[in-house]
Amino acid sequence: MQAAPISELDTDYTPRYVRLARLLRGQIEDGTYTRGSLLPSSNRLAAAHEVSKATALHALEMLVTSGHARHVEAKPHQVIWER
């Protein structure tokens, strides 16, 4: 499933990393990404959503903070949230 760039998702002044984190969190919560699945890399997220790699990394770290994902050094972020 090809997602629209986050710039097309809303027109408010919410930072892009927050919008991307919300999008990913929604996809985790709706079952697009299930417990144990790997999230796209920051490079792939950056390209797909037309943001910088730093923005994508910040969004992924928000998912770690919220308990939706975990990250082990040199490995992709993994979904840990369960419905």
Annotated model-derived regions:
Residues 1-70, 75, 81-83:
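Extreme N-terminal segment that seeds HTH/winged-HTH DNA-binding domains in transcriptional regulators
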